Structures are given as structure tokens and as C-alpha cells.
UniProtKB/Swiss-Prot annotation:
Keywords: Amino-acid biosynthesis, Isomerase, Methionine biosynthesis
InterPro entries per record: IF-2B-related, IF-M1Pi, IF_2B-like_C, Initiation_fac_2B_a/b/d, M1Pi_N, NagB/RpiA_transferase-like
UniProt-recorded name of the protein: Methylthioribose-1-phosphate isomerase
Annotated Gene3D superfamilies: translation initiation factor eif-2b, domain 1 (1.20.120.420), Translation initiation factor eif-2b, domain 2 (3.40.50.10470)
Domain of life: Bacteria
BP GO annotations: L-methionine salvage from methylthioadenosine
Active site location: 233
UniProt keyword annotation of Chaperone present: no
Isomerase found in the keyword field: yes
Organism from which the protein derives: Dehalococcoides mccartyi (strain CBDB1)
Family per record: Belongs to the eIF-2B alpha/beta/delta subunits family. MtnA subfamily.
Cited function: Catalyzes the interconversion of methylthioribose-1-phosphate (MTR-1-P) into methylthioribulose-1-phosphate (MTRu-1-P).
This enzyme's EC code(s): 5.3.1.23
List of residues binding substrate: 44-46, 87, 192, 243-244
């Protein structure tokens, strides 16, 4: 399965909302469709969102029918703003938008700017692929033979437009014949762990167990989990980390049981512009994601629902960050 591909000036994505029941690829021909795909999680995972955002902007720019910079620029700004507004938490999205904006700001010829935007999007994609490969290699060195590693949500190839970050670490350790196994949390409310991580672990041949989110503490107490590895959507300058809701709970549980808690993420996820997790905007998603399951209501009508998509794990709970540049341990 390939999450995202640029082909003949069209963006091809795998609709992740349908997995694992249906493998369906969508051809996105305009930036509005890309924006909608990001909002509705057809493409998801911070690195993949960044790549999709870059391609979406390139698609939009290619559709602008003018050769005059004075006419091109305001139309481009509308495109960039719409893509940037899709999801507020993932740093990779804003990194991609900033890089594409810089290409436009540096250009003087509309045709050349369009070519350069496509080139920049392809470059961002290549960089994310290479980063996840290196993260997987560095992270595998932390995993000891025979360990069982717990992961949360989905940070594999589907989420990263490459090899995977947290899940890439687990898969790489397995491929090194370390005899490891995994626990995957189902990840309510949208079940990315059950639908996507379980699928990727199965395809990679990694022995694993799927568990509900609330079972993690039980298995930590039993002593069968040796490490936790998760991905990230945004990391503040002090190391506070935003990731899928439930990550903070796992970090607290890991600390209570003396289990190392690792965050695997590319440098594009680190946000040096914010001091701490208090500055990270947490996306609030629609209540129907909790009150409905596969189109069927599972909760009473007319009730209040809170549905934050992410939480923030304080840096002091994180043993180390696994990046494409190596391991950054707590306090470094």
C-alpha cells in the first residue's frame, strides 16, 4: 500500500478512512479536494499531511491561468490559506506551506514558479521518506532482543509517506531478527490502531496483539511491555509533545511502571517557534466521531461531547526523541 503518490500532475492518495475493509485510491485533481481529504482524514499522519499539503498547493498553483505575477499572487495566497486551515495541530503541514510560500516569494516568473512549486513538493516528499527510514534505523538500536513494544495510533508508512516513524522502529527491529513483538492500541474514537496499525504490523509479519486503549496499564503492570514508542504531530522547543489523544495517559503509565517512553518524529515536526506545549493548538473534532460508529449511533441523542484529537505529553515523561539525526535523550 502506498499512502500518497504524485503522478502526471495529479495527486493519488489511498483513502485511509476505508481501511482495512476496502483499499481504494482517489485521484485528486484540485486543491479543494486535497484540503477536504486532509480535513476528513482520508490522508492523515503529520508527515503525510505535510506532503499532501505541498502537493495540494502545487495543484492549485498549476490551475491558475495567468502569466502575470500581480494576478497570480493573490490567487496563490487563497490556495495557501485554504490548505493551511485544514488541521491546526500538525507542524509538518505548516512547515510545508511555509516552504511553498517561500518558493513563490522568491520567484519572478509565473511559469518557473509553478515548476519550482512541483519540484519543492517532490523534495518535501523525498525528505520525509528518507527521514522515516533513518528514524527507523536509529530507533531499532534502542529496542533490545525479545522486547515487547507498545505503540499508539498509527505512525507507520500510511502516516509518514515513507517507511514509518514509531511503527518503522518496530518493523525495523523485527527485520533485524531481534525476536520482538508489539502491542497496538485500538485508538478511539477513529480506531487508527485497529484499522491501520494492525494492518501494517500484519503485513510486515510482526507478532502483535491488538488491545483497547484502557488495557495498556494492565499489561504494563503484568510486566509484559518493555517500551512504548509513539509518533508526534508537533514538538515544542522544550520537548513537550502533541500526539494522538491518549498518548499522555500512556506516558504517565509508562513512568509509573519504569518503562521507557520514546517519541519518534522527523525534524519537520519540531516547532522552535513555540516554547512549550501550552502554545500548541489542540484540534477539536466533531462529536459524531464519538457518538457514531460506522454510521450507527452508539450514544444517546442530545448529549455534550468533548473530542480533542490530541493531547500534550510533558517533556519530562519522554526518555528520548528518535529523529533522522539520531537519538536525543532527555535533557540534551
Amino acid at each position: 500500500m502506498k499512502a500518497i503518490e504524485w503522478r502526471n500532475n495529479r495527486l493519488i492518495i489511498l483513502d485511509q478512512t476505508l481501511l482495512p475493509l476496502e483499499e481504494k485510491y482517489l485521484e485528486l485533481n484540485d486543491y479543494h479536494a486535497v484540503a477536504e481529504a486532509i480535513k476528513t482524514l482520508r490522508i492523515r499522519g503529520a508527515p503525510s499531511i505535510g506532503v499532501a499539503a505541498a502537493y495540494g498547493i502545487a495543484l492549485g498553483a498549476l490551475s491558475i491561468e495567468t502569466r502575470y505575477c500581480s494576478e497570480f499572487l493573490p490567487l496563490y495566497q487563497q490556495i495557501s490559506a485554504e490548505i493551511a486551515s485544514t488541521r491546526p495541530t500538525a507542524k509538518n503541514l505548516f512547515m510545508a506551506v511555509e516552504r511553498m510560500d517561500h518558493v513563490v516569494a522568491s520567484g519572478t516568473d509565473v511559469l518557473q514558479v509553478k515548476i519550482s512549486l512541483v519540484d519543492e513538493a517532490l523534495k518535501i516528499h523525498r525528505e520525509e521518506e528518507e527521514a522515516s527510514r533513518k528514524i527507523s534505523t536509529f530507533g531499532a538500536d534502542l529496542i533490545q532482543p525479545g522486547w515487547t513494544v507498545l505503540t499508539h495510533c498509527n505512525a507507520g508508512p500510511l502516516a509518514t509517506a515513507g517507511y514509518g516513524t514509531a511503527l518503522g522502529v518496530i518493523i525495523a527491529a523485527h527485520q533485524q531478527n531481534k525476536g520482538i513483538s508489539a502491542f497496538a492500541t485500538e485508538t478511539r474514537p477513529l480506531l487508527q490502531g485497529a484499522r491501520l496499525t494492525a494492518l501494517e504490523l500484519k503485513e510486515a509479519g510482526v507478532p502483535f496483539k491488538l488491545i483497547t486503549d484502557s488495557m495498556a496499564g494492565h499489561f504494563m503492570k503484568k510486566g509484559v511491555i518493555n517500551a512504548v514508542v509513539v509518533g508526534a504531530d508537533r514538538i515544542a522547543r522544550n520537548g513537550d509533545t502533541a500526539n494522538k489523544i491518549g498518548t499522555y495517559s500512556l506516558a504517565v503509565l509508562a513512568l509509573a511502571h519504569g518503562i521507557p517512553f520514546y517519541v519518534a518524529a522527523p525534524s519537520s515536526t519540531f516547532d522552535k517557534s513555540i516554547e512549550s506545549g501550552n502554545d500548541i493548538v489542540i484540534e477539536e473534532r466533531k462529536p459524531e466521531e464519538i457518538t457514531y460508529l460506522r454510521g450507527q449511533r452508539i450514544a444517546p441523542e442530545n448529549i455534550d461531547v468533548a473530542n480533542p484529537a490530541f493531547d500534550v505529553t510533558p517533556a519530562n515523561l519522554i526518555a528520548a526523541f528518535i529523529t533522522e539525526n539520531g537519538i536525543i535523550r532527555r535533557g540534551e
